[in-house]
Amino acid sequence: MNKTPTTLIIMDGFGIAPPADDNAVTLAKTPVLDRLFQEYAHTTLSASGLDVGLPAGQMGNSEVGHTNIGGGRVVFQDLPRISRAIEDGSFFRNEAYNKAMDDCLKNGTALHLYGLLSNGGVHSHIDHLYALMRMAKDKGLQRVYLHCFLDGRDVSPTSGKGFVQALADKCAELGVGKIATVMGRYYAMDRDKRWERVQMAYDAMVYGEGNHNPDPVDAVAQSYAANVTDEFMEPVVCDSEGTISDNDSVIFFNYRPDRAREITRAIVDPDFDGFQREFFPTTYVCNTEYDATRLNVLVAWPRIAVKNGLGEYLSSLGLTQLRIAETEKYAHVTFFFNGGVEKQYPGEDRVLVASPKVATYDLQPEMSAVEVCDKCVERIESGAYDVIILNFANCDMVGHTGVLEAAVKAVETVDTCVGRVVEATLKMGGIAMVTADHGNAEDMKQPDGSPMTSHTTNLVPFILCGAGTELRTGRLADIAPTILDVMGLACPPEMDGKTLIVK
């Protein structure tokens, strides 16, 4: 007997904003979404700040969004958690940080601090780096090397020079730390097994190979002069003595896991085969749990369990579920949606569709959405699943390029695919929900007219297709309780989100 599915479609990076000449969402031709908004109950959801467990005014992101959606509650995020630890002093008593620094003192080796040099708050925060530098100074460490991954994506594409200058000033102020390398996140923070990029980052930090410039601020300025913005800056070695060597300690201060895994494995995994390199022992600290193996690493801030999230709860009831996305968002509909749990629950199937191998997604704004859609429709028609969680990556990933025309095409691609998935769901007698995890594509320009590549704090849509009802406004944490409500299921006590359906 076929199941009647409840399908959740997450349009990653699709926010709501007034029509404007830089709003790819309203510039795009979206006949499907226009019709869904006309025919079905819809509302708006908050996807940023305190409503998703971030500081007030902080833009949301895909990790946070999926964690809140899957958790059915506001999940306190790593950024405020670590920042509060700095304020109350517990940061400086952290066992993993102390172990890494004490090993340097014991072995006479160097400490390396690396991560995304930004105040964007999505993957890291520069204040956390400054706190680690103060801690190293207080412990009397002499050799502290800083490896800077420039952002240009969650902040302005040319803000990196200012961050590098601020870091250099902080080194002078504290009397600790030397900037050893500077590079764009494109190389150091890949997440799609583009090992040729990761190798360039690795070779700079470990072997001192790449472009050389003793002045890190000038190195960034020269990159700008060559029309290369922060994200794409090729690795530059600023201090040839600052390479990572045997028995050194490394602290990776990024707290978001997905873009921290590959360079970490290149350093710590003796069986790594992404490219040729030597393996050597280090005391390596991951700021959070980057993956479940914890291979040869310490974890500074272990993940707080999200008990009885939607995936775990559905499984406990003996229900079946499907998670489907392309590579760029696969971790979000699985690992993050499950509250940082790597394993599949009984009854949970997963489908991964490869993202296209292009340098930047403005070159192929359709990405792999059609294939994701095809496979999802096929699974819906199989009648095998009670719940389907689907992510279309286009609006976010193309929005990050800052190319408006491509973002418009991305929105139009998603519109078509959403229509097919909703139609297939309704034909099976099911209910489809269309939403987003945060904004992006609806705001593509800075006030000065330059490209805007970051997320927004805008509200996101929520459309309930197949159930005539009235909806209230809410937040992402209310989606899971709404799914359970339309399925006639009670929420587990751990979920403090509330159904969006007006009773």
Which residues fall in each region the model found?
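Feature captures the catalytic ectodomains and active-site-proximal regions of enzymes
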Residues: 1-503
